[in-house]
């Protein structure tokens, strides 16, 4: 690309020109030319007028025309103009085509996102000979929407003026290699990607690859981002990149882009607390959550290069709550202290971006909702730009729909937002200010949100009317199914199929009837290009536990479109059911690549690795799972087992603590045995460190466990082992071991029926003997004889109790002797009891 940038490119990117720029254009002779007219129309928002211009007619019309597909015709016409026109210089031809591409994209956005309605038809700029191939405009639209299918994903059926997106695609994508004079071209291609993707049912790998390529190219154009103008454009660019990355599950890259935009803006944006009132009758100020925005530098951006605010009467109205108790907004005790600086368009877009990133990276939770509402209040406190106002209000309505006091406002507000599209009071130029930084949804998505809200409120008839008008048949089916009108859903789908057969309708019919033949029909109708058909067929197989067939269909679906997160997850589950752990590992690996914070996918991936005996990989994947979900006790349980398997004993101890946080009386004897064995036997862990260094941490863990699980003798015995089991050289360790073993013995003797079962009785006797030996060792180290005697007396009582129970339960009636199988144990107890008596007497003599 040439080093010098065409001067109008920066103005086009920001959506308006400065006086200085217009003066330069005049000096360069742009103003009086066709390029000057195109440029003026674009910057005025008169995109339709550009299509009636004679130059556009020349580019798109041809008197010599063979029968051919509309996309190849348009591409050939535009390429012919670029290569063969003799009236203009090559660079001028490139500039005109580029301006036509930008205008097509902007007009398409107006037709489907911002409004007001566009009065432009294909016959206004295409030759009649070409249009004669189609019986009506709808026929042409259907052909074009077929051409806009990517990776087997269909375009929304009521997309308006798809011819405009096709022209934009041809210029900004197909022939972009011919527009070498335009340095901002890849940025406009990125904007096209963002728009086209929002029309598709699923994410398109083709579009994502194109987006990444465009981002790399723009990053190399350093002269785009020079000076004050460049700084503001840099903020816009990084925000646009962030939204693209976010949509394609690239959360880390998105976060980095949002951070870069925030750094360039030099804003400090923090969630904080402030004293305030939320209700009309609240007497005292209490802590409220707010967003505090500060500038790091006192000097704001130059207003010359930032869009001028839109008059408030032209913005979507922020409706009052009209509640008799809750205030419309929080009333702060010290509002001046938290007064937000007067923000420009780019700065407000940064606040919105931080809000969006926060929403995507936090769980659905009441606290998260409150934090997001704080962001919307912040944004709505400075109503200046249509796109930002729309985005903030749409988010607020989603958050308020679950509140009984706010749901009525949410419905009224959503209706007002849906009506914005047809409102002609606000020009498209005002609506497009900062538009690509805000991810405003298309107008049908807003109407769909309204219908969903109406359905939740029980207004099923009104919701159905909207869904049917939008031809959102899946939602229509859901409405009827939930209302129990199963036959009605089938009837509507068959009526639509009589009008026109589409793969999507057959898939929906298959969902209703649970009939594989419908999916097969959709597959054939799509010429084996419908990822949805194979996806739906696979899900039916999965529901019927036909895992082999399910896997085959899912594999076909992801081959067409590998960016289907839910399909990879379900495919992994199907492979697990088939015990094909290699297949499940591959599927869940793709799943976590697409969505790195999917804890369940990480957990299932680790399960696959465990079954494949790749335990180190399992350990690492579980670490990732826990980063995503710190509260999931099943993941922690898998983690603790895997940690002990691979020798990560320190991690196992941490995991056990976390499980005690999550499940108060959690207990896993097997894990505790492994940890005790590792510490007592001084084993080495995975990194080569000796486990004995963990002795203190393990003792701390047992202290916590035994404070909650007090009645398990095995736990107390393991705790005693950590303290040396009474064989330590340290008297205090032996004392602790004795205490643990005493409690273990108490637990054993409090269990039921042990005294009547010879095997169980023998085991208790052996433990009592062991406890007595530890008591004797402890007594030896006591400096105070009375304490030593007390220790020995407690175990003597245990032994006497056992002798009594043996005599009571295991004495032969004829001989009067204790049962032979216990004879040796009873003899040992008698001898030990006598020894303890002698030792106690000796100690008493020291009093």
Swiss-Prot record:
SMART domains assigned to the protein according to its UniProt record, in alphabetical order: TPR
Keyword Repeat in record: yes
Mapped TPR repeat ranges: 457-490, 496-529, 531-564, 565-598, 600-632, 633-666
UniProt keyword annotations, A-Z: Repeat, TPR repeat
Superkingdom, natural source: Eukaryota
Family: Belongs to the TTC27 family.
UniProt-recorded name of the protein: Tetratricopeptide repeat protein 27
